[in-house]
Regions:
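An extracytoplasmic/periplasmic, membrane-proximal ligand-sensing/linker region
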Residues: 55-56, 67, 200-204, 208-212, ...
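A bilobed periplasmic-binding-protein/Venus flytrap-type ligand-binding module shared by bacterial periplasmic
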Residues: 160-170, 270-283
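Ligand-binding "clamshell"
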Residues: 121-151, 238, 250-263
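Bacterial N-terminal signal peptides that target proteins for export
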Residues: 1-12
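Bilobed "Venus flytrap"/periplasmic-binding protein-like clamshell domains
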Residues: 55-92, 156-231, 314-318
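Paired acidic/hydrophobic, glycine-rich loop segments that form the ligand-binding mouth/hinge
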Residues: 108-112, 239-245
């Protein structure tokens, strides 16, 4: 029998080694690295089934507007998928009520915005423009002063804005919030503003806007109502200006225009699940679970989810369930 040349044996050995190395790399990619919250598209966010909260009980709250109701449902449903019992307190009447419910122990968690925490709850007067610095500042201060934990924030920014119809923008010649001052001075009858009751009294709401921009809105031009009604009232022409949330899907659906915040008054409003320190200490895995949830909630996603409720007519629990399934959190 003719023997195989040593160089041929070496070549076969090299090929075999390469094949084994490539197979090992492929196996690592498929199994994942086990890190907290991977990037990428739908279905890569992790599964609630990876967490076992059987025997645990949580009370979940939220504020009363669409985005908050969706976030509340996402929180409730993902916790239920871990085996936890969840008491539903979703839909509390505003920031102050929700915050008091959290600090008093009536609820264990709800999503709050960094700007609201900094200005409204901590009483600071100067917002921090950089989102990461703002999050770190409110997180550290609230934990030290109030034993409230701010979990990993979502990337979307639901800051306030003033919206107008495109035709109103052209007729009144307004491009920025500063331009409103000219309308108030020269044509006060046109300075009509649909505004939420809470926004009318918040330091980061109308009082702060008036102070920062140097104008005072005529009292007879203010129409106070629930935030959810403002968009249709604005589109119907009942007001020339309206206070809106930038992530609301109705802005695009109704073709509304946003005025530039040329004084950079409005703070950053990244949402974070707020949890009392004692609750997180008992279940520290909440941090990992909701880091995976939060990273998937970018601005485009939140606008789409809001529009599914406010424009398409779906319920918040339906929207939350579908999104959690699409992202792989619910099996």
């Amino acid at each position: 029998m003719r023997s195989t040349h040593p160089k041929v044996i070496a070549l076969f050995s090299l090929i075999a080694a390469l094949v084994l190395a490539l197979a090992a790399c492929g196996g690592d990619d498929e199994s994942g690295d086990g890190g907290g919250g991977g990037g990428g598209g739908g279905g890569d966010g992790g599964s609630a089934s990876e967490f076992d909260f059987s025997g645990k009980e949580f009370t979940v709250g939220s504020k009363e507007f669409t985005e908050q109701l969706i976030l509340g449902q996402i929180t409730k449903q993902v916790l239920e998928a871990t085996g936890a019992k969840v008491n539903d307190q979703i839909g509390l009447a505003g920031s102050v009520v929700a915050r008091e419910a959290l600090t008093s122990g009536e609820i264990d968690m709800y999503w709050e915005y960094t700007g609201t925490g900094w200005i409204t709850h901590l009483g600071e007067t100067e917002p921090i423009p950089d989102p990461e610095e703002q999050y770190t500042a409110v997180k550290d201060a609230d934990l030290e002063k109030n034993d409230i934990e701010w979990l990993e924030p979502a990337p979307f920014n639901n800051t306030y804005a003033f919206a107008v119809r495109e035709e109103t923008k052209e007729e009144l010649g307004v491009e920025s919030i500063s331009d409103i001052g000219g309308v108030i001075e020269e044509n006060p009858d046109e300075a009509t503003l649909c505004i939420g009751t809470e926004f009318s009294t918040r330091d980061d709401g109308l009082p702060g806007v008036e102070k920062s921009y140097g104008f005072e809105w005529p009292g007879d031009g203010l129409k106070k109502m629930q935030e959810g009604v403002i968009y249709q009232q604005l589109d119907d022409g009942d007001c020339n200006f309206g206070e809106v949330f930038q992530t609301d899907g109705r802005i695009q659906a109704l073709g509304l225009a946003l005025l530039e915040d040329d004084e950079s008054f409005f703070p950053v409003y990244n949402p974070s699940l707020n949890v009392r320190k004692d609750v997180l200490a008992e279940t520290p895995e909440l941090k990992d679970l909701f880091a995976q949830v939060a990273e998937k909630l970018d601005t485009e996603t939140m606008q789409r989810l809001n529009a599914q409720v406010d424009v398409e007519g779906l319920t918040e629990d339906e929207v939350a369930k579908t999104w959690l399934e699409d992202e792989g959190f619910l099996g």
